[in-house]
């Protein structure tokens, strides 16, 4: 079992999970399939249990967990475990939910762990629902911004606020993932993914706009938020 911990988040937050193969591959080079995901609280009670049928290749899988109950109310402060079941065993992440004011007192963190070239990455997740939000991360935390859109229309999301001394470093180029659909069908929407890592203390603002890059018109959508790294 590969375990990451402890990832600290404020009440009501969302996390994203990826299993990434490091190259060049030295072992476990065959495809790895995700078969399920579960969320368990500190007393061992299962809050969420999701099975994938059919199973999903880790190359295409992106797990999302919202730390809210069935009524969309934030889960209580405390320790939780996210377990990801795969064809080669279990990956897990220990998560501590705290009040927002406690985030600044938490220490540095490494938001990944690996075995035999397979790395589990944990991200604080933001979407268009977080427009106007202000959140706190620790140095070493990862952030994923996932924005719905449709690349087949020519529209794309882009962060228009570029700073000289960034406290969050973009770790990969923007990725677009279309929703699963039959190969012969076109025009399906999907999600634009942006990945960052908190590398220094300070604050940084983000302004994502959804538009066609060649058009000189107002963006169709705007999502803004700020991040403080403690």
Summary of predicted features, one role per range:
Residues 152-154, 159-180:
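Short, solvent-exposed loop/linker segments at beta-strand-coil boundaries, enriched for Pro/Gly
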Residues 21, 27-77, 85-100, 114:
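Extended, well-structured beta-strand/loop surface patches
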Residues 76-80, 202:
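A glycine-anchored, Pro-Gly-centered beta-turn/N-cap motif
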Residues 24-28, 131-157:
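Solvent-exposed, low-complexity, repeat-rich "mucin-like" stalks and linkers
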Residues 83-87, 111, 209-219:
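Short, exposed beta-strand-loop hairpins at the edges of beta-sheets
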Residues 92-97, 215-221:
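Beta-sandwich strand segments
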Residues 1-10, 117-144:
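N-terminal edge beta-strand
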Residues 196-204:
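Glycine-centered tight-turn and secondary-structure capping sites
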């Amino acid at each position: 079992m590969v375990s990451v911990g402890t990832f600290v988040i404020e009440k009501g937050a969302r996390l994203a999970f990826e299993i990434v193969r490091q190259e060049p591959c030295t072992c476990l080079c065959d495809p790895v399939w995700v078969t399920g995901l579960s969320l368990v609280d500190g007393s061992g009670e299962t809050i969420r249990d999701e099975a994938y049928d059919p199973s999903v290749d880790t190359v295409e899988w992106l797990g999302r967990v919202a730390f809210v109950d069935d009524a969309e109310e934030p889960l209580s402060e405390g320790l939780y475990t996210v377990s990801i079941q795969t064809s080669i065993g279990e990956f897990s992440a220990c998560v501590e939910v705290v009040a927002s004011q406690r985030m600044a007192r938490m220490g540095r963190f490494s938001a990944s762990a690996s075995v035999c070239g397979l790395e589990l990455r944990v991200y604080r997740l933001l979407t268009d629902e977080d427009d106007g939000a202000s959140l706190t991360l620790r140095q070493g935390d990862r952030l994923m911004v996932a924005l719905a859109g449709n690349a087949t229309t020519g529209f794309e999301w882009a962060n228009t606020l570029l700073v000289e001394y960034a406290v969050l470093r973009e770790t990969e180029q923007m990725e677009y993932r279309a929703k699963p659909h039959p190969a012969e069908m076109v025009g399906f929407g999907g999600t634009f993914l942006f990945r960052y890592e908190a590398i220094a203390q300070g604050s940084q603002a983000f302004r994502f706009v959804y538009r066609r890059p060649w058009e000189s018109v107002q963006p169709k959508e705007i999502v803004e938020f700020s991040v403080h790294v403690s």
